Amino acid sequence: MSIGRAVNFNSTVLPVLPLRDVVIFPNIMLPLFVGREKSVHALEYAISSSSHQNEIFLIAQKDGSIDNPEPENLYEVGVLANIIQPLIKLPDNAVKVMIHGVRRGRVIEYISSHTLLQARVALDGHYEYGENEDNIDLEALRRSVIDAFDNWCKLSKKSRPEIIIDPIDQVKEVNQIVDMIASHLNIKVSDKQNILEVYNPKERLKKVFALIEREISILSAQNRLYKTIKSQVESTQKVYYLNEQLKAIQKELGEFENGDEGNILNEFEKKINETKLSEEAKEKAITDLKRYKKMNPISPEATVISSYLHWLLDLPWGKYKDAKINLNAAKKILDENHYGIEKVKDRIIEFLAVLKRVKEIKGPILCLVGPPGVGKTSLAKSMAKAVGRDFVRISLGGIRDESEIRGHRKTYIGSMPGKIIQHMKKANSCNPLFLLDEIDKMGSDSRGDPASALLEVLDTEHNKHFTDHYLEVEFDLSSVMFVATANSLNLPHPLRDRMEIIQLSGYTEDEKISIATHHLIPKLKKEHGLHQKEWEITNEALYELIRLYTRESGVRSMERELAKLMRKAVKAILTDKNKKISVETGNLQDYLGVRKYTFGIAENESLVGIVTGLAYTETGGDILMIESVLIPGKGEIKYTGKLGEVMQESIKAAYSYVRSNCLFFGIKPEKFQNNDIHLHVPEGAVPKDGPSAGSAVCTSIVSLMTNIPVNKSVAMTGEVTLRGRVLAIGGLREKLLAALRGSIKTVIIPSENEKDMQEIPANIKEEINVIFAENIDEVIKVALMHPITSIDDNNEISVSTSIENKDNTFPSSETLKH
């Protein structure tokens, strides 16, 4: 076997032909199609020039997408080639040329030219081969490469292996073998160029062997994948063919009608004939059933149609529950299940009375709005019981997709009707009482706005023609009695306009005691298996439980605490053999643990700049403390506590009013100019907004600047204008309940809210002294512990404004805390 050794000659200047996505090897003949202008000129120059004798230097581009490659876009090593046929002109101005690779060369430098690319090239000499018969490793490597290439040829199936392998077997020179094999491999240009640039024969064999093995692995994986796919396709075709044969056999034997498929078809036909479908729905059902009969039962489309027909035919078309309304019985049911809320129950009875007369629902949709735990959902259940209708409930909290209401179109995988149609099927009648729970908790995003989708559902003029996207036919919702619940009126205006709002306020302590005694305790005893005489709780203990372990407008927390007491009672009866458990104020803490809340006034002492305000939230009323401190500055006011825009504007308005009337309040203007006020509303992590804290902010600023403390037992609420007027507020009942829970004795409210006092329970009026104020001056007179001494324009004391002091105590300035 011969091993080549290259002999270098002197360099020469040659025209250069850049190649796209191809590498030419020595001793390889190949046709090329050349179209670039410079490349064509290079070929013509090589043929016409007597010095080059049809010689041209071929070199591969690093990036084949570049049309006009620069020297840095070309590899350094290429091949000197002979043009062995005349150029053949093609219609697109390109030329076809046949070239034959001669030997390798390395570019020394490129020579600039406008018409063609030339380079000075150092050419490798012809190989001189020496004998080395003892090189067993090289011979083994040569044979391995040829065998691997033979396997590659068989796997690639691009040509007969013997046509390629036989000529290679005849070649003895290692480098020529490598060149011939590399030219046939379907590998990347960079890999071929790498082989071209390696001179050591043994290294060249190793590189080409590794590339062949990689290509064999890829081809083997492709063949396995092809066989797998082919097998799957053949299996599917076989199943389809057998199913068609089975159908034909069943048809011949008359067994098709007795099979499962026949039963399903018979069931569909029977339902279509017996169900009181609308004309549109019946036509749709018949059309889809005809399509279904012609389909393969296991096909995906047949499954979709079958599911659709089940939904369409299982709806309560034309089914109405005979609901006879007895107003006396309805009132009795409402009174038994719900304590208080007389006005709400009266409105429901009025609604039922009209419904009894007209026999159809044309009035507004009722929307029960109130804090959690006041009985909105249970009230809707009682309404259903009172009118003798089926009750279904949809929880709308967190729904953001319009398709949850209207359904998904059948084109989607896993599509199904919306919640309205789903629950109509569940109700199994066309006139249930439908509760839309937590309607204010819906959201919206890119998938649509469910609140807008509800507009059609709640419109009594149009819901007769409600169309679900899945059903694609109209379904009559006009006989459905819709009731909605919400914690707040944070609803889109068009949706709110379709409903009549009924407010459910929080319960007083006396009402909670009555609810616990007559409703919760009997229910919980039954749930925990306690007999009537095995467990009892005193009224005093109930009051303490409400005050120290719950702080809510409703009764859910109270129910949880009572359930906790009864669980411990059951455990004590079974383990300690106690016959009776009695819960009193003395042992309440033993059962419920450490007190969760404090019951008493919001502040233990009357302090400067500390004012008790009142707030109204979705969960009811609450006490809102407002604090302020004075720091040296430039007359600015800062506020913290996660305040909303409306509340920030209210603070600015209150500050401007007090500063503009500083002399009246006995404050020198210099005190504002030389100091900043920092106003804070705890708790800092809870968002707060609204204008009703204006009077409390004014009082806090006046108290701070005059150094007069605010009465700890006084709370206030009201919006303040720049003229000092106190404007009306909302949520008065909830705010007064919060004041009562905080042991507030006096509450100052706007005079415009005096009319709302008729809605306030008598026990609240007895326990709280409610004072009406038209302007902020009246509020400050009641709230501050000391009289205000006004200053005239000359900064002289002129007026002493006396105020009524509820505690009849005026602490000395030395004892005031700030």
From Swiss-Prot:
<keyword id="KW-0346">Stress response</keyword>
<keyword id="KW-0378">Hydrolase</keyword>
<dbReference type="InterPro" id="IPR004815">
    <property type="entry name" value="Lon_bac/euk-typ"/>
</dbReference>
<comment type="function">
    <text>ATP-dependent serine protease that mediates the selective degradation of mutant and abnormal proteins as well as certain short-lived regulatory proteins. Required for cellular homeostasis and for survival from DNA damage and developmental changes induced by stress. Degrades polypeptides processively to yield small peptide fragments that are 5 to 10 amino acids long. Binds to DNA in a double-stranded, site-specific manner.</text>
</comment>
<dbReference type="InterPro" id="IPR014721">
    <property type="entry name" value="Ribsml_uS5_D2-typ_fold_subgr"/>
</dbReference>
<dbReference type="GO" id="GO:0006515">
    <property type="term" value="P:protein quality control for misfolded or incompletely synthesized proteins"/>
</dbReference>
<dbReference type="GO" id="GO:0016887">
    <property type="term" value="F:ATP hydrolysis activity"/>
</dbReference>
<feature type="active site">
    <location>
        <position position="735"/>
    </location>
</feature>
<dbReference type="GO" id="GO:0005524">
    <property type="term" value="F:ATP binding"/>
</dbReference>
<dbReference type="InterPro" id="IPR015947">
    <property type="entry name" value="PUA-like_sf"/>
</dbReference>
<dbReference type="InterPro" id="IPR027065">
    <property type="entry name" value="Lon_Prtase"/>
</dbReference>
<keyword id="KW-0547">Nucleotide-binding</keyword>
<keyword id="KW-0067">ATP-binding</keyword>
<dbReference type="InterPro" id="IPR020568">
    <property type="entry name" value="Ribosomal_Su5_D2-typ_SF"/>
</dbReference>
<dbReference type="Pfam" id="PF00004">
    <property type="entry name" value="AAA"/>
</dbReference>
<feature type="domain" description="Lon proteolytic">
    <location>
        <begin position="605"/>
        <end position="786"/>
    </location>
</feature>
<protein>
    <recommendedName>
        <fullName>Lon protease</fullName>
        <ecNumber>3.4.21.53</ecNumber>
    </recommendedName>
</protein>
<dbReference type="InterPro" id="IPR008269">
    <property type="entry name" value="Lon_proteolytic"/>
</dbReference>
<dbReference type="GO" id="GO:0034605">
    <property type="term" value="P:cellular response to heat"/>
</dbReference>
<feature type="domain" description="Lon N-terminal">
    <location>
        <begin position="14"/>
        <end position="216"/>
    </location>
</feature>
<comment type="subunit">
    <text>Homohexamer. Organized in a ring with a central cavity.</text>
</comment>
<dbReference type="InterPro" id="IPR003111">
    <property type="entry name" value="Lon_prtase_N"/>
</dbReference>
<dbReference type="Pfam" id="PF02190">
    <property type="entry name" value="LON_substr_bdg"/>
</dbReference>
<dbReference type="InterPro" id="IPR046336">
    <property type="entry name" value="Lon_prtase_N_sf"/>
</dbReference>
<comment type="similarity">
    <text>Belongs to the peptidase S16 family.</text>
</comment>
<keyword id="KW-0645">Protease</keyword>
<feature type="active site">
    <location>
        <position position="692"/>
    </location>
</feature>
<keyword id="KW-0963">Cytoplasm</keyword>
<dbReference type="Pfam" id="PF05362">
    <property type="entry name" value="Lon_C"/>
</dbReference>
<dbReference type="InterPro" id="IPR027543">
    <property type="entry name" value="Lon_bac"/>
</dbReference>
<feature type="binding site">
    <location>
        <begin position="370"/>
        <end position="377"/>
    </location>
    <ligand>
        <name>ATP</name>
    </ligand>
</feature>
<dbReference type="InterPro" id="IPR054594">
    <property type="entry name" value="Lon_lid"/>
</dbReference>
<dbReference type="Pfam" id="PF22667">
    <property type="entry name" value="Lon_lid"/>
</dbReference>
<dbReference type="GO" id="GO:0005737">
    <property type="term" value="C:cytoplasm"/>
</dbReference>
<dbReference type="InterPro" id="IPR003593">
    <property type="entry name" value="AAA+_ATPase"/>
</dbReference>
<keyword id="KW-0720">Serine protease</keyword>
<dbReference type="GO" id="GO:0004176">
    <property type="term" value="F:ATP-dependent peptidase activity"/>
</dbReference>
<dbReference type="InterPro" id="IPR027417">
    <property type="entry name" value="P-loop_NTPase"/>
</dbReference>
<dbReference type="GO" id="GO:0004252">
    <property type="term" value="F:serine-type endopeptidase activity"/>
</dbReference>
<dbReference type="InterPro" id="IPR003959">
    <property type="entry name" value="ATPase_AAA_core"/>
</dbReference>
<dbReference type="GO" id="GO:0043565">
    <property type="term" value="F:sequence-specific DNA binding"/>
</dbReference>
